[in-house]
Amino acid sequence: MEKTLKGIVLNSFDFQDYDKIITIYSNLYGKISLVCLGVNKIKSKNKYGINYLSYSNFEIFKSKNKFNLSKLKRSELINSFNHISTDFNLYLYANIITSLVLSLDEQIKNYNLYKTLKLSISIINNKSDFGLKVCVLFMFYFLKIIGNQIDLSKCGFCNSKINPIIAISFTNYCSSCKFCYFDDCILIDNQLSNFINSIFKNDFITNLSQEISTNNLNILTRFILNYYQDIVGTYTTSMYLLSTLIRFN
């Protein structure tokens, strides 16, 4: 059956001489893979809308069997987000986000994730200064999607929400109040404490407007990268490369 949908290309690879298989995250079906016949031919009109990170309209022949690939009929490029490809750091941020979404099961719709993904890639492309912040917030947001959410807004040792948070532990992956502070915890200032509280109380868009210094953002970046590696069990090449760029006092 024919369907029309919008989506962002998460992955694309050659299949046979003139064909590709792409995976997109769509408004109608969530993650879905498509076989794109003939798109590697010079005269193909579909080749522009199926590149990595392309946001496009797709007309597809939807497979009735979930074990068979759906087929692309036509693609129409809406936005290539091409500025991302010109900057190594921006590419890392976008690739971390898309690799997380790519890890999800096929055809489980989550429209809020679709909107957040599209917004995140758009901001990274158009407002490069927000790129790392968007990436980190998305990584925290994605923990909710996979059911692995942590709560740093309370002390992870005594569970108090009354005592102010003064540090975060990279060993126990939790926050610490002044009564539970250990030497292996990293002391944080009020700005980072407030930003962390905002992550767990407010939505993605609200958190984008919260102030955070470069050093504090780097602390949070290192924390969430380590959490994905040690607790979630996900650590992509882009995550590793980003970790090599992060420094904090």
From Swiss-Prot:
Keywords: DNA damage, DNA recombination, DNA repair
InterPro entries documented for this protein: ARFGAP/RecO, DNA_rep/recomb_RecO_N, NA-bd_OB-fold, RecO
Keyword match DNA damage: yes
Pfam families: RecO_C, RecO_N
Record-level GO cellular component terms: bacterial nucleoid
GO biological process per UniProt: DNA recombination; double-strand break repair
Domain of life: Bacteria
PANTHER family per record: DNA REPAIR PROTEIN RECO (PTHR33991:SF1)
Similarity comment: Belongs to the RecO family.
HAMAP family: RecO
Function: Involved in DNA repair and RecF pathway recombination.
Protein name: DNA repair protein RecO
